[in-house]
């Protein structure tokens, strides 16, 4: 009915990266419970499918890697009607691979960690900001880690990405 469509259009929208586990998953559950629409991203389609079955029609699962700039730009450009006007961006996706001593660490792992933890956050933020500025409203929340402030063994690169 027309009334439910209007009601549906008035729901606030949160975009959560890294929604398939931990903080991202629990945040999605909470926002759905509070009556929001949730766009959730992850790299594992099977986990997104499980979450979609649980959360229902107000959850839009998107399977992609936030570290891939062209893919991020394309995904944001092609959001379906009813999910375009994002009220909150939760940059939650993160990688912690490659936690080795600096002298013997795998530089490919470090590149992947930097691409996800820093570049992915920047790509998503850049895609969301124009709409928020145009509407004069919006919030961006970046999930950090105590690892950005406290050193831990073999956490050199991870700590740097979480402090950025």
Question: Would you name each region that the model predicts?
Answer:
Residues 145:
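Residue(s) in the substrate-gating loop at a strand-loop-helix junction
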Residues 64-74, 107:
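The beta1-alpha1 cofactor-binding region of Rossmann-like NAD(H)/NADP(H)-dependent oxidoreductases
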